[in-house]
Design a protein with these regions (language model features):
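Intrinsically disordered, low-complexity segments enriched in small residues
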Residues: 1-48, 52-304
């Protein structure tokens, strides 16, 4: 309805990939879009995100999922793409913060260590319970680090909508990944274009975008040079101190020589991370975690 507000039960969270979602022969096919009515604007918003959940949802037979209504207590939605059923159950005991919850749920739903790569989770955290800027975290299993990592749908406060519905997590499990699980019409055409793109990445990325070195953070100096950096909430397009947050700074933090990627077969490998970052404040002080990013949007929107 036109008068639906962000915290109305009728407000939906929609998560979808696309016609070639999850295809491993073309880079970027692991992305999903998340749509809802934003608590910040009371208007429709969308956010783009990587991670395993979108492709796994597609492989389980769903083009999209719509989360509507409100639960009385915290719940987990489980999409079983192995035995083909969906289950909703209460989850009072599990953690709320994603970096802890994701590990708990992966252990809960994976059959063994080798099955951890077949679990995709959407969750948020305690910040979403206490603000209108909560984000959604989408997990992916980093086989090289043997750890669960996360990408973010960070715009519009969508995580706050998620928690307002009393959803603690949405979990999707599949039996494994193959080359054409969503049965695209013309796989040969995708493969041909994928090979072309992969060749360009191999030959040009190190001298152009450097996605495999610094991810989307390479855009910082480009946007500053072209007067497009959102400085002081778009009052200006550049700033003399922009080099303090440009890609060279982030590269010094990012772990190098690891082919990062938030989806299988994506040759951009732009999911850069800071390993063993020690938290210095709050309830997790002293713990060492993996910090993903920052992406350009975070560095520019919150840094400039």
């Amino acid at each position: 309805r036109p008068d639906t507000r962000w915290d109305d039960p009728d407000n939906e969270i929609v998560i979808a990939s696309g016609p070639v979602g999850g295809i491993t022969q073309y880079s970027g096919a692991g992305k999903s879009l998340v749509v809802t009515i934003s608590p910040q604007t009371d208007s429709v918003m969308d956010s783009n995100v990587g991670g395993f959940f979108g492709p796994f949802l597609k492989f389980s037979g769903f083009d999209a999922i719509e989360l509507q209504g409100k639960a009385a207590n915290d719940v987990i939605v489980f999409i079983n793409g192995v035995d083909h059923y969906v289950e909703v159950f209460e989850a009072p005991a599990e953690a709320i913060d994603s970096h802890v919850l994701a590990e708990q749920l992966t252990e809960m739903f994976a059959n063994d260590e080798s099955d951890r790569k077949n679990i995709g989770i959407v969750s948020t955290g305690s910040a979403a319970d206490n603000s209108l800027i909560g984000m959604l975290n989408f997990t992916f299993y980093d086989g090289r680090r043997k750890k669960i990592r996360m990408k973010q749908a960070g715009r519009g406060g969508i995580g706050s909508v998620f928690r307002n519905k009393k959803i603690k997590a949405v979990v999707c499990k599949i039996p494994g990944v193959k080359g054409n699980l969503n049965n695209v019409v013309d796989l040969e055409a995708i493969q041909e274009r994928g090979r072309r793109f992969n060749r360009e990445m191999r030959e040009l990325d190190d001298s152009q975008c450097r996605m495999r070195q610094v991810g989307t953070a390479h855009l910082m100096e480009i946007m500053d040079d072209h007067d497009l950096l959102p400085t002081h909430n778009y009052k200006y397009g550049s700033h003399k101190d922009a080099p303090r947050i440009d890609s060279a700074v982030w590269k010094s933090f990012f772990t190098q020589n690891i082919p990062d990627g938030c989806w299988i077969g994506c040759n951009m490998a732009c999911a850069k991370a800071v390993d063993d970052y020690e938290i210095t404040t709050g309830p997790y002080a002293g713990q060492k975690v993996i910090v993903d990013g920052p992406e350009y949007e975070t560095a520019a929107g919150l840094g400039s």
